[in-house]
Curated annotation (Swiss-Prot):
It is found in: Cytoplasm. The record marks E111 as: Important for acyl-CoA specificity. It catalyses: L-homoserine + acetyl-CoA = O-acetyl-L-homoserine + CoA. Belongs to the MetA family. GO terms for cellular component: cytoplasm. One of its GO terms (molecular function) is homoserine O-acetyltransferase activity. InterPro entries: Class_I_gatase-like, HST_MetA, MetA_family. It comes from Geobacillus kaustophilus. The active site is at C142, H235, E237. This is Homoserine O-acetyltransferase.
Amino acid sequence: MPINIPKDLPAKEILEQENIFVMDEERAYSQDIRPLNIIILNLMPEKEKAETQLLRLLGNSPLQVNVTFLRPATHEPKTTSKHHLEQFYTIFPHIRHRKFDGMIITGAPVEQLPFEEVTYWDELTDIMEWTKTNVTSTLHICWGAQAGLYYHYGIPKYPLPEKCFGVFNHTVEAKNVKLLRGFDDVFRMPHSRHTDVKREDIEKVPDLTILSMSDKAGVCLVASNDGRRIFLTGHPEYDATTLKEEYERDLAKGLPIHIPESYFPNDDPSQPPLNTWRSHANLLFVNWLNYYVYQETPYEWE
C-alpha cells in the first residue's frame, strides 16, 4: 500500500521514478480504509533528502500511511527554504491536540553539544513527553535515539575518540523479537556519529532491551519492553551515496575525517559505493509499522 503525501512534495517525483508506491491526498481520501497517521520530526539539516529517504522506507509496506512533517518552532533551519517549510511542515502547537499511530524523530547535527545547550531542547522534551499519551510507537534515529534515551531514562552519551563512520556488521542479540523478524543473524547498517551510548548504562534499565549490537559500532538497536519507544543509533535510511557526500563535505571543510569503513569498494573513494543495507532497512521499517504501530494502535483514538 502507498504512502499518502502532499501532491507537490519534491520527494513525490523521486519516489515515483524509483517505483515506490505513493498516493496524493485526493486519491487517498477516496479510499474507505483506516490509514496509519505517522508524524516525522525532521531535525536533519538537508530536510528534503531526509524526507525522501524516510518516505522510501515507509512506502514499502502493505499499509496506507498518512505522513505529517514536523519541525521545531524554536529553530530556524539554514539549509531548507522558508517556502518548503511553510508548504509542507507544521509546528508542535498546531498538532499537540492530535493522536498519531507512529512517530519518527530523526538525527540532528548537534551531537557534540550537551543536550541542554541545543536551541530546541525544551521544545523537544515537550514533544517526547507528549508521545507518552499521543503516539502508539516512536522510532528515534541516531542523535534522536541518544536524546530519547537521555530524556526518558537518563542515559548519557559519551564522546568518541574518532567518528564512528562507515557501514558495520551487526548481530541480533534478542531472539523472537518482532522488530527483527526475518533478519539475518548478521546484517549491515551505516553509522555516522561522534558520540555513543554504553551497553552497561542501558542494561541497568529494566524497561529496556538491547536488540542488536556491533563489535565496532556498539549498541545499535534498543526497545522499551512495551515497544512504544525504539532507539536506533545507525542510519538505515541512508542512500548509497550519503556517507560519500558526508566524507567529501568534511574533507572540503578541512575537518579530521577518515574514509568510511567497509563502504567504498577496496577502500577507494573514486569507486562508487554499493548499498549493502537496503533490504534490512526496508524490513526494519515494515516490521515497525506492522507489529509496533498497526497491530497496537486503536482504530479510533479516544
